[in-house]
Amino acid sequence: MKATAWNTGWLFRHLDSQEKFVPVTLPHDAMQAEPRTELSAGGVNSGWYEGRDYEYIRRFIPDKSLRSKTLMLEFEGVYHLAEVYLNGEKVAERPYGYTNFYADLTDRVRFDEENELRVIARNSDQPNSRWYSGAGIYRPVMLWTADKQQHIALNGVRIRTVSINPATVEVTVRTVGAGRVSVDVLAGEKQAASAAADTTGEITLTLTVPDAKLWDVEHPNLYTCRVRFGSDEDLQTFGIRTLSWGKKGILLNGERVIVQGACIHHDQGILGARCYAQGEERRVRLLKENGYNAVRSAHNPCSKALLDACDRLGMLMMDEYIDHWYIHKTEYDYVPYFEKWWKQDMADMVDKDYNHPCVILYSTGNEVSETAQKKGIQLTRELTEYLHSLDNTRPVTCGINIFFNFLSSIGFGVYSDEKAKK
């Protein structure tokens, strides 16, 4: 599918006011413009910023060439409780503020007239986070288009290294419609390997790459996988590397790697929660220069730009799902939505991460004292098994503080629904 940035032409205002809309360019952190006061309900966790609710609108007249296209609008991150409306009709929602999600505009767009896209983001429900969250549409928005009858499915290309001697990769392609799929592995502009076959919906092609340059933390060599199907084309950057784990720890290309990592949150300092590719790359570069070879996305799925930077610079990534499950850590956090949404959230996280060689590990949660309870132990199994069903090429862990669990087991838990209300 073809991607077009949709970051300009937006208007913004507070949801609970009749103030005039002002133009903004995405990514946009609405919370940074709020007053800072000692009376802020978020307190030190929010940087003393007050919380409000917001609305964004974008008016557009679609090009006539889009009539025969599938139209999918991707929001990489909206904090939080996002609702998306097209011409007054709700077309998407996502409570979690850190996972990318899609609004299907196909057959809903009105041609030859102006359309209005409206996005609501809420952040007045303070406190809802244990760190500075930012607010609004703080990550990029992309419009994905393709022929309705025949195209590569969204997130429909998955690349897996089978072996490194010889260097062999499997490319699985999901399509809408039947036809011939061709796959090329490119080293720069040069074709390194190719294969083709007919498909009726899903096919896996195996390619051997001669004289392959492997990906690791010291030599982050990257290739491009070009998939063609009908008039559609998909380009995926990937690295050839194997990953295994066991008694010897993490093995990358059969060699043990000592993981020297740091936890990083999603904000970019004085830029707030806005996600800029240059800012993400700067963070990774500084960490590499200071001896780190791994980062943990604390405590939520990271941006696509951060993954790209880690791929290019040779930084390992542990992508983490969430800070809590069913026990509140703040009064208005994600707990009420977790049970309904965790599977979709995780599926979107894996779709985002799968082709990135930097991702070596998933985490289902951070300091989850639920694991001290029978219910929580069962949930741990469900989360882990579900992630393995989505991606069996990477291990799954969970941030567990044994001392916190001990305190919880004797009735003195650090986290509890009651404490979250104080």
Segments the model singles out, each with a brief description of its role:
Residues M1, L154-T161, L214, R226-L287, ...:
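N-terminal carbohydrate-binding accessory modules
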Residues A3-D16, A30, S46, G51-I152, ...:
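Accessory beta-strand-rich segments of carbohydrate-active enzymes
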Residues Y85-V91, L186-G188, G230-S231, N253:
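Short strand-turn-strand beta-turns centered on an Asx-Gly dipeptide
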Residues G88, V141, Y223, G254, ...:
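Conserved, mostly hydrophobic/aromatic
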Residues R110-D112, R174-G246:
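Extended acidic/polar, glycine-enriched regions
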Residues K148-G177:
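Surface beta-strand/loop "capping" patches
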Residues A294-K422:
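Substrate-binding/catalytic cleft of secreted carbohydrate-active enzymes
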